[in-house]
Amino acid sequence: MSKINKEIAIFIVFLILVALWGLFVKVPVEETKTPDPESQVSGMTIQFKDGISESEVRTILQNCNMTRNYRMTYDNSSEDYYIMADKDNWSDIRRELVDEMKETNKKNWTVSTPAHVIRKEDYYVLPISGQAIKDEKFLAILDKYDIGVEKFLWCDISFLYSDGPLTYWIPKEDAIRIKNELEQNDNIFSVQFDYLFPPFDPTT
């Protein structure tokens, strides 16, 4: 075998070995994970008691570490109503409302699923409909227990750019801390999250 043919044969054997190595050896590939769609909170919707002023809302928010600049929208024009019943009368009031709704086939008085009933210290907060506050039988039950109709006040929080582009969100862990802190306030019923969708992916 000539020297050239021997070199060609060696080269072919080398290529075969490289091919076999490629089949059996797995080259590690860096995995990129898509951010969890509920990991980036872009804003919050805060449910306040009736009668709280815009200046009071701003003071409450200023006393909470929001971690990022934000825009606040104060809305006192909603038509979302509620009643507050103390824990001693709650069962009786709830039963009378349910019985009356069944008897008169008026199922639109309340939003009565457990997810919508809010416990605030010694009171239960029950959302009610606009139709209910115009119904004499419904109002008669409230009069019996000396309960008035009130309106929820809503406040929307939108987090803003402050540390460069595409930073208009906070981590869910920070949002949960803020939520827990705000819901300790007597004037706040609940805090709901608005998520960034689609989530910001720093790898793209």
Curated annotation (Swiss-Prot):
A Pfam family: UPF0228
Family in the record: Belongs to the UPF0228 family.
Name used for this protein in its record: UPF0228 protein MA_0511
Source species: Methanosarcina acetivorans (strain ATCC 35395 / DSM 2834 / JCM 12185 / C2A)
Organism placement in taxonomy: Archaea, Methanobacteriati, Methanobacteriota, Stenosarchaea group, Methanomicrobia
